[in-house]
C-alpha cells in the first residue's frame, strides 16, 4: 500500500467539477467518479475534509451583476453548495464511506451545524467531513472557506481540484498556446502577479498560516491519490 505524504487534507472541489462537460447541474457519473477517488485516499487512512463550491447551480456574483442584492445572491450560492455536498455525501455512502455534512448556516434537518471540535473528531474516526454553506457570510468565496477550514482543522495541505486546467499558468492556456505552467510558486507570487489560483483573501489566509496548496486537474482519474502520496502533479503553492 502506498504511503501518503499528508495525514489530513482539505479537498476543494469547484461546483463546475460536479457538472462535468455539461457545464451546469450535477452529473451523477462525474460525482460518482470523484467519490471513488475520495474512497481511494480514505482507504490510505488519510483524514479527508471536502469543501464544495456551488457554481454549477448558482453564482452570487452573477446575481449581483444582474442587479440582485449581493448578500442575498451570496446566500443563494451557499445553499447551492449544500445541494452539492448532499449529493457527494450520498455518492460516498453508496461506496461504503462514512461521511458527514457540516453547514455554516444551521439546517439541522439535513446536516450537522459546523462545530470545529466535532469536525476534528469525525476526521479522527476516519469519516469524510464535507463543509457546506461557505463561511456562512456573504462576500466570502468557497476558496476562502477552504483556507479557513484548513487552518481551523490544522490540515497539512489543500488540494484544489480543477476541472478545466491542470495547474497554474502565466496566461490562460485555453486562449494562449504559449502559456507556461508553473511547477511551484509562492503565495507572494500569486498575489503580486494576480494569478488566478484562488482569490486574494484565500491566498493571504493560506500564506499567513503556512498551508501549502496543490492545484491539479480532477479530470484525470487517480489524480487525487497521486497528489496525496506526493507525486509531482499540477502546481504547488507555498510559503512567502
Swiss-Prot record:
Which chemical reaction does it catalyze?
UMP + ATP = UDP + ADP
Q: Which GO terms describe its biological process?
A: 'de novo' CTP biosynthetic process; UDP biosynthetic process
Which residues bind ATP per the record?
12-15, 55, 59, 163, 169, 172
Listed A to Z, the keywords are: Allosteric enzyme, ATP-binding, Cytoplasm, Kinase, Nucleotide-binding, Pyrimidine biosynthesis, Transferase
Chief subcellular location: cytoplasm
* Pfam families, per database record: AA_kinase
Quote the Gene3D superfamilies the UniProt record gives: Acetylglutamate kinase-like
Molecular functions per Gene Ontology: ATP binding; UMP kinase activity
InterPro entries associated with the record: AceGlu_kinase-like_sf, Asp/Glu/Uridylate_kinase, Uridylate_kinase, Uridylate_kinase_bac
- Which function does this protein serve? Catalyzes the reversible phosphorylation of UMP to UDP, with ATP or dATP as the most efficient phosphate donors. Is also able to phosphorylate 5-fluoro-UMP and 6-aza-UMP.
What other facts are recorded?
The peripheral distribution of PyrH is related most probably to its role in the synthesis of membrane sugar components and its putative role in cell division.
Q: What is this protein called?
A: Uridylate kinase
Amino acid at each position: 500500500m502506498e504511503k501518503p505524504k499528508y495525514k489530513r487534507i482539505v479537498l476543494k472541489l469547484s461546483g463546475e467539477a460536479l457538472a462535468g462537460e455539461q457545464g451546469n447541474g450535477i452529473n451523477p457519473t462525474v460525482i460518482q467518479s470523484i467519490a471513488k477517488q475520495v474512497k481511494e485516499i480514505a482507504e490510505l487512512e488519510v483524514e479527508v475534509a471536502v469543501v464544495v463550491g456551488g457554481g454549477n447551480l448558482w453564482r452570487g456574483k452573477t446575481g449581483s451583476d444582474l442587479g440582485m442584492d449581493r448578500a442575498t445572491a451570496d446566500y443563494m450560492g451557499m445553499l447551492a453548495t449544500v445541494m452539492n455536498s448532499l449529493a457527494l455525501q450520498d455518492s460516498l455512502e453508496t461506496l461504503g464511506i462514512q461521511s458527514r455534512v457540516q453547514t455554516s448556516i444551521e439546517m439541522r434537518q439535513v446536516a450537522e451545524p459546523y462545530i470545529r471540535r466535532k469536525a476534528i473528531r469525525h476526521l479522527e474516526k476516519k469519516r469524510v467531513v464535507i463543509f457546506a454553506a461557505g463561511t456562512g457570510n456573504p462576500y466570502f468565496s468557497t476558496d476562502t472557506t477552504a483556507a479557513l477550514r484548513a487552518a481551523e482543522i490544522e490540515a497539512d495541505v489543500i488540494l484544489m481540484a480543477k476541472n478545466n486546467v491542470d495547474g497554474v499558468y502565466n496566461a490562460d492556456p485555453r486562449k494562449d498556446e504559449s502559456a507556461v505552467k508553473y511547477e511551484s510558486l509562492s503565495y507572494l507570487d500569486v498575489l503580486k502577479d494576480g494569478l488566478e489560483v484562488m482569490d486574494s483573501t484565500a491566498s493571504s489566509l493560506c500564506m499567513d498560516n503556512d498551508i501549502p496548496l496543490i492545484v491539479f486537474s480532477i479530470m484525470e482519474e487517480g489524480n487525487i491519490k497521486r497528489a496525496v502520496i506526493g507525486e509531482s502533479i499540477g502546481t504547488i503553492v507555498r510559503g512567502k
